[in-house]
């Protein structure tokens, strides 16, 4: 729900008493935003609950429809409720955005740098600032024309000077414009993305002889400077490794005209060529390459490392090469401790462990410690291996005897504890005479009693008859007339009478229901007869 409609709905709820005179049945035809189902339901609610209660349902249903405020205002005017319509319209307009009345501003193109001259020339050129860093330019693409070329660089530079500014610019003796590095940096802002797009388009038509075929669109630039970034337009089919100095010859042929800018352009061309061709650097073991000749993408060091590259015979004295994209360590291989895994790169080559000072990478160091003595591997960590005890040999090497001895020695203490004399004693019992179905857990008072092997049924009594078990002691009055020793002071029975009175079973039989009714009837008759006899005696 928009903000204005939400505020209008809350205003109507707060001032609901002002809308009580709105007839729901009358206003429904003026609300086309409501569906037929909504209108039928509201009419039924108005018939059952009345008009006032139905107004709540009407506003609740309206606020779910888009644009309901305009429909409601028009419906109020149709029902001749102009005051309410104006009130709702004023509230609705007060919450409308302020800028919605005026048309939106036309879209303006993004602002351009202040140094940009008038309309661009037919072709866009490339230029590099003095610090070899490309500046930003507008994000929209620049028009590029590949086929049309100006007559001469002198005329193009003169036209660009006239369009840019009337100030005087020094010229070379041969007529070409000469600019400083600050002017070039201000007049040639180009992004790397723009260079990549235009390099791919201009690379197909550019040749080594066309050194000044394009003119800059942002000011006069010398032909040599404008040509420097186009060093990447050479064919990229040759991927063979070569020296780092083998850059495009056209990129360095114009270094005599402008030394500072040409060197920056040549460096940029070298970086582009190295990133595209990914040429590896090959250094001999005796000489070191200069630091500025290494590309930025090769994390190698200048120290000669006695390692062997992939698919190269393992001869550290004759060949010591470093792959261009494999990071190598600056420390010699002899400093690698024996307890660390070796580099997995030269894993499939036979390496002389005595010369290289390291074990082959196929054998883990943990296996070397167990199968090879420390004297055969002349590494720096050999003294460490001599101090530490050797790991136990595997069971396969000794026929499994060492593993069995270790396990037996570990369990020797536990076995001696379990077999102490006098703690655990075995007892031979008589064989069981019953069946397995009679087995059960029976309660025993003490552990020293002998086992009972009788059937379990003997421990229970039959429940064929009902009996009353008397377990209370006889009173002292019953024992006064009986001969014998006196009773106990606690009131207990005498020893002779213990069997008679301690437990006595009195059998009782359940009477039938007919006998009970007969006894009750006989008793009633006797009572009535007795009452009649007594009544007659009183009368006489």
Swiss-Prot record:
Region (Disordered): 95-297, 314-358, 373-419, 476-507
Region ranges (Interaction with TRAF6): 153-158, 455-460
Biased composition (Low complexity): 241-266, 388-403
Outcome (variant: residue 251 to A): Complete loss of cleavage by protease 2A of enterovirus 71
Residue ranges, annotated region (Interaction with TRAF2): 143-147
GO molecular function annotation: CARD domain binding; DNA-binding transcription factor binding; identical protein binding; molecular adaptor activity; molecular condensate scaffold activity; protein kinase binding; protein serine/threonine kinase binding; protein-macromolecule adaptor activity
GO annotation terms (biological process): activation of innate immune response; antiviral innate immune response; cellular response to exogenous dsRNA; cytoplasmic pattern recognition receptor signaling pathway; defense response to bacterium; defense response to virus; innate immune response; intracellular signal transduction
Tissue: Present in T-cells, monocytes, epithelial cells and hepatocytes (at protein level). Ubiquitously expressed, with highest levels in heart, skeletal muscle, liver, placenta and peripheral blood leukocytes.
Cytoplasmic side: 2-513
Consequence when changing residue 457 to D: No interaction with TRAF6
Outcome of mutating residue 265 to A: Complete loss of cleavage by enterovirus 71
Effect ascribed to mutating residue 145 to N: No interaction with TRAF2
Effect recorded for residue 155 to D: No interaction with TRAF6
Transmembrane segments: 514-534
CARD domain residues: 10-77
Subunit record text: Self-associates and polymerizes (via CARD domains) to form 400 nM long three-stranded helical filaments on mitochondria, filament nucleation requires interaction with RIGI whose CARD domains act as a template for filament assembly. Interacts with RIGI, IFIH1/MDA5, TRAF2, TRAF6 and C1QBP. May interact with FADD, RIPK1, CHUK and IKBKB. Interacts (when phosphorylated) with IRF3; following activation and phosphorylation on the pLxIS motif by TBK1, recruits IRF3. Interacts with NLRX1. Interaction with NLRX1 requires the CARD domain. Interacts with PSMA7. Interacts with TRAFD1.
PANTHER family: DUF3504 DOMAIN-CONTAINING PROTEIN, MITOCHONDRIAL ANTIVIRAL-SIGNALING PROTEIN
Record-given protein name: Mitochondrial antiviral-signaling protein
Organism, scientific name: Homo sapiens
Gene name in the database record: MAVS
């Amino acid at each position: 729900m928009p903000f204005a409609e939400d505020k209008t709905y809350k205003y109507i709820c707060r001032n609901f008493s002002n809308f009580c005179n709105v007839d729901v049945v009358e206003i429904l035809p003026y609300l086309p935003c409501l569906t037929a189902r909504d209108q039928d339901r509201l009419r039924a609610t108005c018939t059952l609950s009345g008009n006032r209660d139905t107004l709540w349902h009407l506003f609740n249903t309206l606020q779910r429809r888009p644009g309901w405020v305009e429909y409601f205002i028009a419906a109020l005017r149709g029902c001749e409720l102009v005051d309410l319509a104006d009130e709702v319209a004023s509230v609705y307009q007060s919450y409308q955005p302020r800028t919605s009345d005026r048309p939106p501003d036309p879209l303006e193109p993004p602002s351009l740098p202040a140094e940009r001259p008038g309309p661009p020339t037919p072709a866009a050129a490339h230029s590099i600032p003095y610090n070899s860093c490309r500046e930003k330019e507008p994000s929209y693409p620049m028009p590029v024309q590949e086929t049309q070329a100006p007559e001469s660089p002198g005329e193009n530079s003169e036209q660009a000077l006239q369009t840019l500014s009337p100030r005087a610019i020094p010229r070379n003796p041969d007529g070409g414009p000469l600019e400083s590095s600050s002017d070039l940096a201000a007049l040639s802002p180009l992004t790397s993305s723009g260079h990549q797009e235009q390099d791919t388009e201009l690379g197909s038509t550019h040749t080594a002889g066309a050194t000044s075929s394009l003119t800059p669109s942002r000011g006069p630039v010398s032909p040599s400077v404008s040509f420097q970034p186009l060093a990447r337009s050479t064919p990229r089919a040759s991927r063979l490794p070569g020296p780092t100095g083998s850059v495009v010859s056209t990129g360095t042929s114009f270094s005599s005209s402008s030394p500072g800018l040409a060197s920056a352009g040549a460096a940029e061309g070298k970086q582009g060529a190295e990133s595209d061709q990914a040429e590896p650097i090959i250094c001999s073991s005796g000489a070191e390459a200069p630091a500025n000749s290494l590309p930025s993408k090769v994390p190698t060091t200048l120290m000669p490392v006695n390692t062997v590259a992939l698919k190269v015979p393992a001869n550290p004295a004759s060949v010591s090469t470093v792959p261009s994209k494999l990071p190598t360590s600056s420390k010699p291989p002899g400093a690698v401790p024996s307890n660390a895994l070796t580099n997995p790169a030269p894993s499939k080559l036979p390496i002389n462990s005595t010369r290289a000072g390291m074990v082959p990478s196929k054998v883990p160091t943990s296996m070397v410690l167990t199968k090879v003595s420390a004297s055969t591997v002349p590494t720096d960590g050999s003294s460490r291996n001599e101090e530490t005890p050797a790991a136990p040999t595997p069971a396969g090497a000794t026929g499994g005897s060492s593993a069995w001895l270790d396990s037996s020695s570990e369990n020797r203490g536990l076995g001696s504890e379990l077999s102490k004399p006098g703690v655990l004693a075995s007892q031979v019992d008589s064989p069981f005479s019953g069946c397995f179905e009679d087995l059960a857990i029976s309660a025993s008072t003490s552990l020293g009693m002998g086992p009972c092997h009788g059937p379990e049924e003997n421990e229970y009594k039959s429940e064929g008859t009902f009996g009353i078990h008397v377990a209370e002691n006889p009173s002292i009055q019953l024992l006064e007339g009986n001969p014998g020793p006196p009773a106990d002071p606690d009131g207990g029975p005498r020893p002779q009478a213990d069997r008679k009175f301690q437990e006595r079973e009195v059998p009782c039989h359940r009477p039938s229901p007919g006998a009970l009714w007969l006894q009750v009837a006989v008793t009633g008759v006797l009572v009535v007869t007795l009452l009649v006899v007594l009544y007659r005696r009183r009368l006489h």
